[in-house]
Protein backbone atom coordinates (compact mmCIF):
# COMPACT_ATOMS: atom_id res chain seq x y z
CA UNK A 1 0.00 0.00 0.00
CA UNK A 2 0.97 3.63 -0.50
CA UNK A 3 0.83 6.05 2.43
CA UNK A 4 1.25 9.81 2.62
CA UNK A 5 2.92 10.83 5.89
CA UNK A 6 2.67 14.53 6.77
CA UNK A 7 4.38 15.89 9.84
CA UNK A 8 7.26 17.41 11.74
CA UNK A 9 10.57 15.81 10.83
CA UNK A 10 12.96 15.45 13.77
CA UNK A 11 16.46 14.05 14.26
CA UNK A 12 16.83 12.15 17.53
CA UNK A 13 20.30 12.04 19.08
CA UNK A 14 21.17 9.76 22.01
CA UNK A 15 24.40 10.47 23.89
CA UNK A 16 25.10 7.71 26.40
CA UNK A 17 27.79 7.38 29.03
CA UNK A 18 28.68 6.84 32.66
CA UNK A 19 28.29 9.17 35.62
CA UNK A 20 30.90 8.65 38.32
CA UNK A 21 31.30 12.08 39.88
CA UNK A 22 29.76 15.49 40.41
CA UNK A 23 31.16 18.57 38.72
CA UNK A 24 33.29 20.85 40.95
CA UNK A 25 31.90 23.81 38.97
CA UNK A 26 28.23 23.23 39.86
CA UNK A 27 26.15 20.52 41.57
CA UNK A 28 25.58 18.58 38.35
CA UNK A 29 26.68 15.11 37.22
CA UNK A 30 29.56 14.71 34.78
CA UNK A 31 28.68 12.39 31.89
CA UNK A 32 31.61 10.50 30.40
CA UNK A 33 30.39 9.86 26.86
CA UNK A 34 30.80 6.32 25.55
CA UNK A 35 28.30 6.24 22.69
CA UNK A 36 26.30 8.45 20.34
CA UNK A 37 23.39 7.30 18.19
CA UNK A 38 21.42 9.30 15.63
CA UNK A 39 17.99 8.04 14.54
CA UNK A 40 14.95 9.31 12.65
CA UNK A 41 12.45 10.85 15.07
CA UNK A 42 9.16 12.70 15.14
CA UNK A 43 7.05 12.03 12.06
CA UNK A 44 9.98 10.16 10.52
CA UNK A 45 9.64 7.49 13.19
CA UNK A 46 6.10 7.01 11.88
CA UNK A 47 7.59 6.70 8.38
CA UNK A 48 9.93 3.98 9.61
CA UNK A 49 7.05 2.10 11.23
CA UNK A 50 4.98 2.37 8.05
CA UNK A 51 7.88 1.19 5.88
CA UNK A 52 8.61 -1.76 8.19
CA UNK A 53 4.96 -2.82 7.92
CA UNK A 54 5.24 -3.06 4.14
CA UNK A 55 4.02 0.35 2.96
CA UNK A 56 5.55 2.62 0.37
CA UNK A 57 5.79 5.93 2.22
CA UNK A 58 5.66 9.45 0.81
CA UNK A 59 7.17 11.47 3.69
CA UNK A 60 6.17 15.14 3.50
CA UNK A 61 7.65 17.80 5.77
CA UNK A 62 10.29 20.50 6.14
CA UNK A 63 13.96 20.53 7.12
CA UNK A 64 16.57 23.27 7.19
CA UNK A 65 19.58 23.42 4.91
CA UNK A 66 22.10 22.20 7.48
CA UNK A 67 24.17 19.23 8.60
CA UNK A 68 21.28 17.71 10.54
CA UNK A 69 19.09 17.60 7.43
CA UNK A 70 21.93 15.86 5.57
CA UNK A 71 21.99 13.29 8.37
CA UNK A 72 18.21 12.84 8.08
CA UNK A 73 18.45 12.26 4.32
CA UNK A 74 21.25 9.72 4.79
CA UNK A 75 19.32 7.85 7.50
CA UNK A 76 16.19 7.84 5.34
CA UNK A 77 18.09 6.36 2.42
CA UNK A 78 19.57 3.71 4.70
CA UNK A 79 16.02 2.86 5.83
CA UNK A 80 14.73 2.67 2.27
CA UNK A 81 12.61 5.81 2.64
CA UNK A 82 11.97 8.22 -0.24
CA UNK A 83 13.31 11.74 0.40
CA UNK A 84 12.13 13.62 -2.69
CA UNK A 85 8.93 15.05 -1.18
CA UNK A 86 10.67 16.89 1.67
CA UNK A 87 10.99 20.67 1.42
CA UNK A 88 14.41 22.14 2.27
CA UNK A 89 13.92 25.64 3.70
CA UNK A 90 16.96 27.91 4.00
CA UNK A 91 15.22 29.92 6.76
CA UNK A 92 14.44 26.89 8.91
CA UNK A 93 16.53 24.89 11.36
CA UNK A 94 16.18 21.12 11.30
CA UNK A 95 14.53 20.00 14.54
CA UNK A 96 16.85 17.93 16.72
CA UNK A 97 16.37 16.40 20.16
CA UNK A 98 19.51 15.35 22.00
CA UNK A 99 19.06 13.12 25.04
CA UNK A 100 21.88 12.59 27.53
CA UNK A 101 21.63 9.16 29.15
CA UNK A 102 23.34 7.24 31.94
CA UNK A 103 22.26 3.80 33.18
CA UNK A 104 19.21 3.92 30.87
CA UNK A 105 18.02 7.11 32.58
CA UNK A 106 17.70 10.48 30.87
CA UNK A 107 19.72 13.22 32.55
CA UNK A 108 18.80 16.04 30.19
CA UNK A 109 17.17 16.73 26.83
CA UNK A 110 18.45 19.50 24.58
CA UNK A 111 16.12 20.72 21.81
CA UNK A 112 17.20 22.68 18.75
CA UNK A 113 14.26 23.85 16.66
CA UNK A 114 12.53 26.71 14.91
CA UNK A 115 8.88 26.89 13.86
CA UNK A 116 8.82 25.91 10.19
CA UNK A 117 5.54 27.60 9.23
CA UNK A 118 5.39 30.03 6.31
CA UNK A 119 2.79 30.56 3.59
CA UNK A 120 5.37 29.67 0.94
CA UNK A 121 6.19 26.35 2.62
CA UNK A 122 2.48 25.66 3.11
CA UNK A 123 1.87 26.08 -0.62
CA UNK A 124 4.80 23.80 -1.50
CA UNK A 125 3.56 21.06 0.83
CA UNK A 126 -0.03 21.36 -0.41
CA UNK A 127 1.15 21.01 -4.00
CA UNK A 128 3.09 17.85 -3.14
CA UNK A 129 0.09 16.32 -1.35
CA UNK A 130 -2.25 17.08 -4.25
CA UNK A 131 0.18 15.48 -6.71
CA UNK A 132 0.34 12.26 -4.65
CA UNK A 133 -3.20 11.84 -3.36
CA UNK A 134 -4.50 9.81 -6.32
CA UNK A 135 -1.85 7.12 -5.83
CA UNK A 136 -2.17 6.78 -2.07
CA UNK A 137 -4.26 4.37 0.00
CA UNK A 138 -4.32 6.37 3.24
CA UNK A 139 -2.98 9.57 4.80
CA UNK A 140 -1.36 9.86 8.19
CA UNK A 141 -0.72 13.17 9.99
CA UNK A 142 1.95 13.15 12.70
CA UNK A 143 1.73 16.52 14.43
CA UNK A 144 4.60 17.36 16.80
CA UNK A 145 3.66 21.03 17.03
CA UNK A 146 6.65 22.39 15.11
CA UNK A 147 4.65 24.21 12.43
CA UNK A 148 4.25 21.83 9.50
CA UNK A 149 0.69 20.76 10.37
CA UNK A 150 -0.95 24.15 9.90
CA UNK A 151 -4.71 24.63 9.81
CA UNK A 152 -4.77 25.52 6.10
CA UNK A 153 -2.56 22.60 5.08
CA UNK A 154 -4.64 20.08 7.00
CA UNK A 155 -7.91 21.58 5.75
CA UNK A 156 -6.78 21.10 2.14
CA UNK A 157 -5.35 17.65 2.85
CA UNK A 158 -8.46 16.31 4.60
CA UNK A 159 -10.73 17.88 1.96
CA UNK A 160 -9.05 16.26 -1.04
CA UNK A 161 -8.59 12.96 0.80
CA UNK A 162 -12.29 12.84 1.69
CA UNK A 163 -13.21 13.65 -1.92
CA UNK A 164 -11.19 10.61 -2.97
CA UNK A 165 -12.64 8.49 -0.13
CA UNK A 166 -9.17 8.13 1.39
CA UNK A 167 -9.01 7.82 5.18
CA UNK A 168 -6.99 10.38 7.15
CA UNK A 169 -5.53 9.27 10.49
CA UNK A 170 -4.35 11.93 12.96
CA UNK A 171 -1.79 11.73 15.77
CA UNK A 172 -2.54 15.14 17.34
CA UNK A 173 -0.64 17.74 19.32
CA UNK A 174 -1.73 20.84 21.22
CA UNK A 175 -5.19 22.15 22.01
CA UNK A 176 -6.36 23.21 18.54
CA UNK A 177 -8.22 20.13 17.34
CA UNK A 178 -10.25 22.33 14.96
CA UNK A 179 -7.54 21.85 12.34
CA UNK A 180 -8.26 18.09 12.34
CA UNK A 181 -11.97 18.53 11.51
CA UNK A 182 -13.53 15.88 9.26
CA UNK A 183 -10.59 13.47 9.56
CA UNK A 184 -11.45 9.79 9.79
CA UNK A 185 -9.61 8.83 12.98
CA UNK A 186 -7.73 10.63 15.75
CA UNK A 187 -5.47 8.95 18.34
CA UNK A 188 -4.76 11.30 21.27
CA UNK A 189 -3.01 10.14 24.42
CA UNK A 190 -4.26 11.18 27.86
CA UNK A 191 -2.41 14.52 27.94
CA UNK A 192 -3.56 15.39 24.43
CA UNK A 193 -7.14 14.49 25.38
CA UNK A 194 -6.98 16.73 28.45
CA UNK A 195 -5.94 19.64 26.21
CA UNK A 196 -9.45 19.70 24.72
CA UNK A 197 -11.58 17.86 27.30
CA UNK A 198 -11.80 19.49 30.72
CA UNK A 199 -13.54 16.74 32.67
CA UNK A 200 -12.09 13.90 34.79
CA UNK A 201 -10.40 10.99 33.00
CA UNK A 202 -10.48 8.13 35.49
CA UNK A 203 -13.11 5.53 34.63
CA UNK A 204 -13.83 3.78 31.34
CA UNK A 205 -17.03 5.82 31.12
CA UNK A 206 -14.99 9.03 31.43
CA UNK A 207 -12.89 7.99 28.46
CA UNK A 208 -15.96 6.99 26.46
CA UNK A 209 -17.43 10.44 27.04
CA UNK A 210 -14.15 12.06 25.99
CA UNK A 211 -14.05 10.04 22.76
CA UNK A 212 -17.61 11.04 21.86
CA UNK A 213 -16.94 14.68 22.78
CA UNK A 214 -13.94 14.79 20.44
CA UNK A 215 -15.82 13.13 17.57
CA UNK A 216 -18.93 15.30 17.97
CA UNK A 217 -17.08 18.57 18.52
CA UNK A 218 -14.58 18.21 15.70
CA UNK A 219 -16.64 16.13 13.24
CA UNK A 220 -14.21 13.22 13.35
CA UNK A 221 -15.62 9.78 12.60
CA UNK A 222 -13.63 7.66 15.06
CA UNK A 223 -11.45 8.24 18.13
CA UNK A 224 -8.93 6.07 19.95
CA UNK A 225 -7.51 7.37 23.23
CA UNK A 226 -4.26 5.64 24.16
CA UNK A 227 -4.09 5.20 27.93
CA UNK A 228 -0.59 3.84 28.54
CA UNK A 229 -0.60 0.86 30.89
CA UNK A 230 -4.42 0.93 30.86
CA UNK A 231 -4.63 0.19 27.14
CA UNK A 232 -7.03 2.01 24.82
CA UNK A 233 -10.58 3.31 24.60
CA UNK A 234 -12.18 3.28 21.15
CA UNK A 235 -15.26 4.96 19.72
CA UNK A 236 -16.10 3.77 16.22
CA UNK A 237 -19.01 6.20 15.67
CA UNK A 238 -21.49 3.65 17.06
CA UNK A 239 -19.98 1.64 19.91
CA UNK A 240 -17.31 1.91 22.61
CA UNK A 241 -14.58 -0.65 23.15
CA UNK A 242 -11.80 -1.00 25.71
CA UNK A 243 -8.56 -2.85 25.03
CA UNK A 244 -6.36 -3.85 27.94
CA UNK A 245 -2.59 -3.62 27.88
CA UNK A 246 -0.47 -6.55 29.01
CA UNK A 247 2.81 -4.66 28.99
CA UNK A 248 5.23 -5.94 31.63
CA UNK A 249 8.42 -3.92 31.26
CA UNK A 250 8.35 -0.26 30.22
CA UNK A 251 11.80 1.12 29.43
CA UNK A 252 10.88 4.05 27.19
CA UNK A 253 7.53 5.34 25.92
CA UNK A 254 9.21 7.44 23.20
CA UNK A 255 7.58 6.70 19.88
CA UNK A 256 4.82 4.46 21.24
CA UNK A 257 2.15 6.74 19.77
CA UNK A 258 3.98 6.67 16.43
CA UNK A 259 3.83 2.89 16.39
CA UNK A 260 0.15 2.84 17.36
CA UNK A 261 -1.03 5.16 14.59
CA UNK A 262 1.20 3.55 11.94
CA UNK A 263 0.07 0.01 12.81
CA UNK A 264 -3.58 1.01 13.20
CA UNK A 265 -3.75 2.83 9.86
CA UNK A 266 -1.92 0.05 8.02
CA UNK A 267 -4.04 -2.83 9.24
CA UNK A 268 -7.35 -0.96 9.05
CA UNK A 269 -6.65 0.10 5.47
CA UNK A 270 -5.74 -3.51 4.67
CA UNK A 271 -9.26 -4.50 5.68
CA UNK A 272 -9.21 -5.20 9.41
CA UNK A 273 -12.01 -3.66 11.44
CA UNK A 274 -11.02 -0.62 13.47
CA UNK A 275 -11.22 -2.70 16.65
CA UNK A 276 -9.05 -5.53 15.31
CA UNK A 277 -6.54 -3.04 13.90
CA UNK A 278 -6.42 -1.29 17.29
CA UNK A 279 -5.76 -4.60 19.03
CA UNK A 280 -2.80 -5.23 16.73
CA UNK A 281 -1.57 -1.65 17.29
CA UNK A 282 -1.80 -2.21 21.04
CA UNK A 283 0.43 -5.28 20.74
CA UNK A 284 2.93 -3.35 18.62
CA UNK A 285 3.08 -0.55 21.21
CA UNK A 286 3.66 -3.06 24.02
CA UNK A 287 6.71 -4.29 22.13
CA UNK A 288 8.34 -0.91 21.41
CA UNK A 289 7.98 0.41 24.98
CA UNK A 290 10.06 -2.56 26.15
CA UNK A 291 13.03 -1.13 24.21
CA UNK A 292 15.08 1.96 24.97
CA UNK A 293 15.00 4.91 22.60
CA UNK A 294 12.96 5.70 19.52
CA UNK A 295 12.43 2.24 18.06
CA UNK A 296 9.96 1.28 15.31
CA UNK A 297 8.15 -2.04 15.10
CA UNK A 298 8.97 -4.45 12.29
CA UNK A 299 6.75 -7.06 10.69
CA UNK A 300 8.68 -10.04 12.05
CA UNK A 301 8.45 -8.75 15.63
CA UNK A 302 4.76 -8.01 15.24
CA UNK A 303 4.04 -11.41 13.72
CA UNK A 304 5.45 -13.05 16.85
CA UNK A 305 2.60 -11.45 18.84
CA UNK A 306 -0.18 -12.34 16.39
Tell what function each PLM region has.
Residues 4-6, 109, 137-140, 169, ...:
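Structural motif
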Residues 1-20:
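Positively charged, low-complexity intrinsically disordered leader regions
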Residues 146-240:
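Conserved phosphate/ATP/ADP-binding segment of small-molecule kinases
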Residues 135-148:
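Short acidic, glycine-rich surface-loop motifs adjacent to enzyme active sites
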Residues 86-92, 99-135:
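Conserved phosphate-binding/catalytic loop of the ribokinase/pfkB sugar-kinase fold
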Residues 217-222, 246-305:
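Conserved post-catalytic alpha-helical subdomain immediately downstream of the catalytic base
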Residues 8-9, 144, 259:
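Active-site metal-binding loops of divalent metal-dependent hydrolases
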Residues 3, 24, 28-95, 305:
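Substrate-binding N-lobe of the ribokinase-like
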Amino acid sequence: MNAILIGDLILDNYISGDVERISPEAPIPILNQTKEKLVLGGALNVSRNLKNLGNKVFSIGIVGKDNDSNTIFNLMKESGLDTKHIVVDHNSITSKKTRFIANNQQLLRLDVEKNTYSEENEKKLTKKIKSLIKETDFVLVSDYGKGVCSKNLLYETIKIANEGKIKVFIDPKGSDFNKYKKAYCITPNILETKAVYNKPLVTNKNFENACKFICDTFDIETCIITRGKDGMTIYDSENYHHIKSNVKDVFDVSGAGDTVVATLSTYHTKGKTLIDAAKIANLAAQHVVSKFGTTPINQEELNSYL
